[in-house]
Amino acid sequence: APKELQVSYAHKSSELVIGGDECDINEHPFLAFLYSRGNFCGLTLINQEWVLTAAHCDRRFMPIYLGIHTLSVPNDDEVIRYPKDNFICPNNNIIDEKDKDIMLIRLNRPVKNSEHIAPISLPSNLPSVGSVCRVMGWGSITAPNDTFPDVPHCANINLFNDTVCHGAYKRFPVKSRTLCAGVLQGGKDKCMGDSGGPLICNGPFHGILFWGDDPCALPRKPALYTKGFEYPPWIQSIIAKNTTETCPP
């Protein structure tokens, strides 16, 4: 990865993993990294040519790094790709502007499976409340002051009932298209720079990080994830070149 990836600052539009540990280098072959002019996000590889992230991670210039672990020391199989096509779920309701925060990106060239690159499966069912899920990313590992690591951090968090997020964020309309996850006592959370990254529950990808409180990792302040289970028909239709497919209602 180029030197400019060793950033010490990112805008508050991105989110982090606090309270976790360095991910095992072999546990995240599907995890990709987007770095663009001080902003960075996580992405998830779902097949050789397509990745998922949050719609709010969209930028004009979007280099996507795959097969990456240590930002300052490239893996032999690390590659860079750029978006060929981007697809989002349009949502014109300002009140629900964070609803449907998902973007499907076609890479400019396919990637090959390798030691550090492999896709993850889409969900075929909903994870149950109480599930232990895994979050990961290169986001800040401290709060409220940010510290950005050279390696991705991973943490185990719990999946909660939607009412927990309703109670935590009264001003925020938690919809059925979101998953609510965190650690109620605090201390573990996603954070600055983790936006767009995956929520992994029992094997498959189940969510895309799109919103959390600032500062991160406070007690009783879980984060919100776009619910992956709602989107496979939309994703598969677009991949099959039915680009007029409408999003879930």
UniProtKB/Swiss-Prot annotation:
GO annotations of cellular component type: extracellular region; secretory granule
Function: Thrombin-like snake venom serine protease that releases only fibrinopeptide A from human Aalpha chain of fibrinogen (specific coagulant activity was 251.7 NIH thrombin units/mg). Also shows fibrino(geno)lytic activities in vitro and defibrinogenating effects in vivo.
Temperature behavior of the protein's activity: Optimum temperature is 40 degrees Celsius.
PANTHER family: KALLIKREIN-1 (PTHR24271:SF47), KALLIKREIN-RELATED (PTHR24271)
Organism from which the protein derives: Bothrops barnetti (Barnett's lancehead)
Domain Peptidase S1: 17-240
Keywords: Blood coagulation cascade activating toxin, Disulfide bond, Fibrinogenolytic toxin, Fibrinolytic toxin, Glycoprotein, Hemostasis impairing toxin, Hydrolase, Protease, Secreted, Serine protease, Signal, Toxin, Zymogen
PTM note: Glycoprotein, contains approx. 52% carbohydrate which could be removed by N-glycosidase. Glycosylation is important, since deglycosylated barnettobin loses its clotting and defibrinogenating effects.
Protein known as: Thrombin-like enzyme barnettobin
Activity regulation comment: Both coagulant and amidolytic activities are inhibited by PMSF. Amidolytic activity is partially inhibited by DTT, chymostatin, SBTI and TLCK, but not by heparin and EDTA.
Record note on pH: Optimum pH is 6.0-8.0.
Signal peptide positions on this chain: 1-10
Catalytic machinery residues: 56 (charge relay system), 101 (charge relay system), 195 (charge relay system)
Residues carrying a glycan: 145, 161, 242
Oligomer status and interactors: Monomer.
Name of the top EC class for this enzyme: hydrolase
Propeptide: 11-16
Tissue specificity annotation: Expressed by the venom gland.
Domain of life: Eukaryota
Subcellular location: Secreted
Further remark: Negative results: does not degrade beta- and gamma-chains of fibrinogen (FGB). Does not hydrolyze the plasmin substrate S2251 (D-Val-Leu-Lys-pNA).
Disulphide linkage map: 23-154, 41-57, 89-247, 133-201, 165-180, 191-216
Molecular function GO terms recorded: serine-type endopeptidase activity; toxin activity
UniProt-listed Enzyme Commission number(s): 3.4.21.-
Coiled-coil region(s): none
